[in-house]
Amino acid sequence: MRGAGAPHRTRVKICGLTRLEDARVAREAGADWLGFIVAGESPRRIAPAAAGAIVAALPGAAAVAVMVAVTPDQALGFARATGAARVQLHRVDPAGWPADFPLPVTFVVPVRADGRLQAPLPPDHLLLMLDAHDPVLAGGTGATLPWATAAALAATRDLVLAGGLDPDNVEDAIEQVRPWAVDASSGLERAPGLKDHERVRRFVAAVRRADAVRA
């Protein structure tokens, strides 16, 4: 995924989508990935079939099926029902994941406030996401993580930075961490699962401003 010579374009994932109108706005704003939480406790959880209907209504959209503590067979079933091009796994050990899984996988590693990682890192060839640790929720808490920890890892591998990102802090986050991608959910909402369209647009615009400086 890393390339030399070309200006970096930070990928954007808008997660916790539950409505077609929100997904459409995210895509029109320039989001690269649309995230749907299809397995796991979350106020933003959506049935795989409902997520699949949204994806089907947006031809060409790249959907990510977000899941917590699933088996490979479960993950594949949820992904197929969603029409997802990628799966994002929380609370799954990458060491036990089959190498021949047919879809790209993002493994999420929670980070404590003191910078300690709460799960093993996946191998470098697999995409890593860092999110703020929470003892109950797997994501979408609105809490940020220590960006210095993320920056140290981003210097050695591609990673997705999550955890409390919003239109007001994402430029600083990109400047400090220099991630391959950013992920936002609760920071773009007016209520859990209901996106604030103006905040979505502002978020993507802020990422592009950060990229212009980074170039």
Which residues make up each language-model segment?
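Conserved N-terminal beta1-alpha1 strand-loop-helix module at the mouth
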Residues: 1-215
